[in-house]
Amino acid sequence: MGLRFSRGRRRGGMVSLISVISTIGIALGVAVLIVGLSAMNGFERELNNRILAVVPHGEIEAVNQPWTNWQEALDNVQKVPGIAAAAPYINFTGLVESGANLRAIQVKGVNPQQEQHLSALPSFVQGDAWRNFKAGEQQIIIGKGVADALKVKQGDWVSIMIPNSNPEHKLMQPKRVRLHIAGILQLSGQLDHSFAMIPLADAQQYLDMGSSVSG
């Protein structure tokens, strides 16, 4: 309609120039708006899929660590309306080593079966490695960025140094544990460069926590 209007009337040079500039300006504005909305929609989708889907909606931790009577609290949480899933976990910091390469990482001990109901993390582990992820096998899943920094791949072995303390909370020589890389986690984000997972039962054993957890 606008094209017919512009062709159907004879105008002066200045009026025609203004009309052309206005048309181009409107077209550019609409194009920028479309691109901006597309970028926002893509960002929202990635935010939901790669960040919010892998981060728990809430975490509960005891003031005095480790948490020994967590089972009662877990039972109460699971009874709250709207809670889809809940599970215990252990968080600790370690230093992973492969040859001359070192990397500080945040390690999370999780229950492999329950984690599938809690977050989308298992779906970002390459291949079908999560199916074989279980306690008692000296396994660890590390982020893609950590693997690249250490120059390792799935199937390789790494050493992880874990903080060690006695009952009086005095620091001792770090405990060194040899672990097999069971899988690579690739979220294409910052988490890939500082995160690793091990089975919950193994974390309890390495940290001498018995049946206690962090949260």
Q: Could you describe each region identified by the protein language model?
A:
Residues 16-23, 39, 50, 106:
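Residue-level recognition of specific faces of alpha-helices
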Residues 75-197, 201-211:
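A structural signal for hydrophobic secondary-structure junctions
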Residues 6, 51, 77-78:
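Hydrophobic C-terminal alpha-helix "anchor/cap" residues
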